[in-house]
Amino acid sequence: MVPTTYYLALSGLLFALGMIGVLTRRTAIMVFLSVELMLNAANLSLVAFARAWGDLTGQTAVFIVMTLAAAEVAIGLAIIVAIFRKRETTNVDDLAGLKG
């Protein structure tokens, strides 16, 4: 049986990698993937705590987060594709002109 601390350490590492990706990447797709990595890290920690405490509440929360993440993927990719068609780039620095 793997200790819960290993799962939490992996979750923290994945979250940190996602945060680094959000802060350093300039393409919208990579920022989007980094946010998804952060969501999956949160899911891993929820499952780890649910397993440690023997409660199904954490696993239920994971299904809710996965549903929200699927909606985010659909909407986010649609926005990225629309911006790419309009601007011919996915560089987030070039999108500063969308401020209105």
UniProtKB/Swiss-Prot annotation:
It is an enzyme of class 7 (translocase). The chain crosses the membrane at residues 2-22, 29-49, 63-83. One of its GO terms (cellular component) is NADH dehydrogenase complex. Keywords: Cell membrane, Membrane, NAD, Quinone, Translocase, Transmembrane, Transmembrane helix, Transport. InterPro entries: NADH_UbQ_OxRdtase_chain4L/K, NUOK/Mnh_C1-like. Its EC number is 7.1.1.-. It is found in: Cell membrane. Belongs to the complex I subunit 4L family. NDH-1 is composed of 15 different subunits. Subunits NuoA, H, J, K, L, M, N constitute the membrane sector of the complex. NDH-1 shuttles electrons from NADH, via FMN and iron-sulfur (Fe-S) centers, to quinones in the respiratory chain. The immediate electron acceptor for the enzyme in this species is believed to be a menaquinone. Couples the redox reaction to proton translocation (for every two electrons transferred, four hydrogen ions are translocated across the cytoplasmic membrane), and thus conserves the redox energy in a proton gradient. This is NADH-quinone oxidoreductase subunit K. The lineage of its organism: Bacteria, Thermotogati, Deinococcota, Deinococci, Deinococcales.
